[in-house]
UniProtKB/Swiss-Prot annotation:
Belongs to the METTL9 family. Changing Y295A: Abolished binding to S-adenosyl-L-homocysteine. One of its GO terms (cellular component) is endoplasmic reticulum. This is Protein-L-histidine N-pros-methyltransferase. The gene is METTL9. S-adenosyl-L-homocysteine binds at E174, N210, Y295.
Amino acid sequence: MRLLAGWLCLSLASVWLARRMWTLRSPLTRSLYVNMTSGPGGPAAAAGGRKENHQWYVCNREKLCESLQAVFVQSYLDQGTQIFLNNSIEKSGWLFIQLYHSFVSSVFSLFMSRTSINGLLGRGSMFVFSPDQFQRLLKINPDWKTHRLLDLGAGDGEVTKIMSPHFEEIYATELSETMIWQLQKKKYRVLGINEWQNTGFQYDVISCLNLLDRCDQPLTLLKDIRSVLEPTRGRVILALVLPFHPYVENVGGKWEKPSEILEIKGQNWEEQVNSLPEVFRKAGFVIEAFTRLPYLCEGDMYNDYYVLDDAVFVLKPV
């Protein structure tokens, strides 16, 4: 019995020691990894990946038009965001898992999109807002609840999970079969891309998060959202990466320009935000509130996490 207990303790200690050694956080593994990847063709830092965290939320209000200045909500790095960052940093240090993911991605990219590969591996989760940031934007309290949420292009459902406590029924759409599998595991009702507009009922909140720049007909999508949104109390929460670079991902990871082009003008974040009220007006919406947030993605063996600049809007129908 003592021998068995001793063997068990030794095994657990060995596993713990191996994890400590073979993590990208340990000096030994960092050194080995740098030696393996240094030289021409080594990994480059992700665009924006090393920005100071406070810069993610900075907006020059003086560059906003007067109507937008009145509805801007200042956001900050909060606990929910920091938890995501900490978890992402930890995951990026799991050397063997990251090597496995890299190998699978290289092989499967020949016939699968990057999104589908991420869904298969259960990696690459996105983060748009924390529960507190979501509540502040919609001006709701933690106990607020309404009937139906529709999350368009929901991915693996991790962002849906942040919104879900406020809704009795949760619907989602997604093109990727592996992401649909992830959504179904979370017990969300997945609707087809041509089904959500024809259910016969309306939605109280529709989220369209970082989808307009990755769909073929963004203006048509906005108009379809307007047609199924509850007309009085219904709201849309919409996130858009700025500067705006619209492309559609096809199988094999190929990118093509969309058939519909949104008229978004300007060179920087504030200038492009100023052109969006007219874009939304054409689809039947006005901006009720908006903020600047980082659009975060879990990292890999090259970077702890990836980040883009998001403008997140609450739209109401007119």
